[in-house]
Curated annotation (Swiss-Prot):
Any one GO biological process: tricarboxylic acid cycle
Organism of provenance: Herminiimonas arsenicoxydans
Keyword Ubl conjugation found: no
Entry protein name: Malate dehydrogenase
HAMAP family: Malate_dehydrog_2 (MF_01517)
Length: 329
């Protein structure tokens, strides 16, 4: 028997990431090749954005995707999020010229408070929320705190792009395919303070750390390359990474819904206190997923260097959280 369609909301739907994302969702890349989807697309309430969204929907229609059971355009989160099973919160206020990080946090806090409240009011009680729009961890924290009637575990932030970037750097360094690499993780914030960690990773079952055996490369090349990759892409292309971000969002949600078969992935999730990360902090952890639930990989040894890096990214997240506290009161 055919499956009932799942409702997927995407915000910032006419933006660059949205444009790279929507066609792949409609094609079945997000939820599987036998799962029909209904797209509920949100854009800001101005004529230019809504017209752009109409154009995107015309293109989606013109693809005649067999799995697409419906698509609608919205300017109000209360209609866009009605009964949704998955919400991809892509739209966020970008940092403008002369804007301090504090201003950026405040501008986004307003957006994600409204969206969190709307999800709380009208989304499915099992909705899975992924925040892509930056600063992703803190935006996800704000949305979660604005939705007290939904389980906190339903809210996640995207660190999969950092995870995939780290994978590709290790594959290039070792000359092995990305599929051979397992047990990699990225700790912390989706920002240059993140900590990509291959101490436990394996290639074809053998230790990556031993295969690379180069601590100087780890500290001076690998960590900064992954941490500053977004900036390097802006420098080269003139615009921020969109297709790779959309791809990471699809990886994140697909693995969350369909399971990882015991493989580790990285998700930004509300901490349960593991590894000394304060409860509710939206933090990148190694996880495995099964039956639509994620579980933090436990029992990993945190050496002195790793602890230092984790403390650094945690400090930044705590400062961001402090910076928006008054807006959540």
């Amino acid at each position: 028997m055919a499956k009932a369609p799942m409702r997927v909301a995407v915000t910032g739907a006419a933006g660059q990431i949205g444009y790279s994302l929507l066609f792949r969702i409609a094609n079945g890349d997000l939820l599987g090749k036998d799962q029909p989807v209904i797209l509920q697309l949100l854009e800001i309430d101005n004529e230019k954005a809504q017209n752009a969204l109409k154009g995107v929907i015309m293109e989606i229609d013109d693809c005649a995707f067999p799995l697409l059971a419906g698509v609608s355009a919205h300017s109000d989160p209360m209609t866009a999020f009605k009964d949704v099973d998955i919400a991809l919160l892509v739209g966020a206020r970008p940092r403008g010229p002369g804007m301090e990080r504090k201003d950026l946090l405040e501008a986004n806090a307003q957006i994600f408070t409204v969206q969190g409240k709307a999800l709380d009011a009208v989304a499915s009680r099992n909705v899975k929320v992924l925040v892509v729009g930056n600063p992703a961890n803190t935006n996800a924290y704000i949305a979660m705190k604005s939705a007290p009637n939904l389980p906190a575990k339903n809210f996640t932030a995207m660190l999969r792009l950092d995870h995939n970037r780290a994978l590709s750097q290790i594959a290039a360094k070792t000359g092995k395919p990305v599929t051979a690499i397992e047990k990699l993780t990225v700790w912390g914030n989706h920002s240059p303070t993140m900590y990509p960690d291959y101490r436990f990773a394996t290639i074809d079952g053998k230790s990556v750390k031993e295969a690379i055996n180069d601590e100087v490369w780890n500290k001076d090349v690998f960590l900064p390359t992954v941490g500053k990759r977004g900036a390097a892409i802006i420098e080269a292309r003139g615009v921020s990474s969109a297709a790779s971000a959309a791809n990471a969002a699809i990886d994140h949600v697909r693995d969350w819904v369909l399971g990882t078969n015991g493989k580790w992935v990285t998700m930004g999730i509300p901490s349960d206190g593991s590894y000394g990360i304060p409860k509710d902090t939206m933090f990148g952890f190694p996880v495995t997923t099964e039956n639509g639930e994620y579980k933090i990989v436990q029992g990993l040894e945190i050496d002195a260097f790793s602890q230092e890096r984790i403390n650094l990214t945690l400090k930044e997240l705590s400062e961001e959280r402090e910076g928006v506290k008054h807006l959540l009161a």
